């Protein structure tokens, strides 16, 4: 797992969900651990798409439940 991507994702998640950066770990679940609702999740996906200049299809977004899932998806898209 790329440390650079992980740190950037954690920063975006912290900002989007208004949680302390220290609370965001690679295994943090957006809804269960960080209190995101469905709208938060949509906004988070949009922020990740913009930050990494990628497109996350709805089907893929549904499978991204944790910070680590997001990092893995971004790494695969960025090659």
Swiss-Prot record:
Gene name in the database record: acpP
InterPro entries: ACP, ACP-like_sf, PP-bd_ACP, Ppantetheine_attach_site
Cellular component GO terms held in the UniProt record: cytosol; membrane
Pathway: Lipid metabolism; fatty acid biosynthesis
Span of domain Carrier: 3-78
Localization per record: Cytoplasm
Protein's name in the database: Acyl carrier protein
Function: Carrier of the growing fatty acid chain in fatty acid biosynthesis.
Annotated organism of origin: Prochlorococcus marinus (strain MIT 9301)
NCBIfam families reported for this sequence: acyl_carrier, PRK00982.1-2, PRK00982.1-4, PRK00982.1-5
């Amino acid at each position: 797992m790329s440390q650079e991507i992980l740190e950037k994702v954690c920063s975006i998640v912290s900002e989007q969900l208004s949680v302390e950066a220290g609370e965001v770990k690679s295994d943090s679940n957006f809804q269960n651990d960080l209190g995101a609702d469905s709208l938060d999740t949509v906004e988070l996906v949009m922020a990740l798409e913009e930050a990494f200049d990628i497109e996350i299809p709805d089907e893929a977004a549904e499978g991204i439940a944790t910070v680590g899932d997001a990092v893995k998806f971004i790494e695969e898209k960025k090659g």
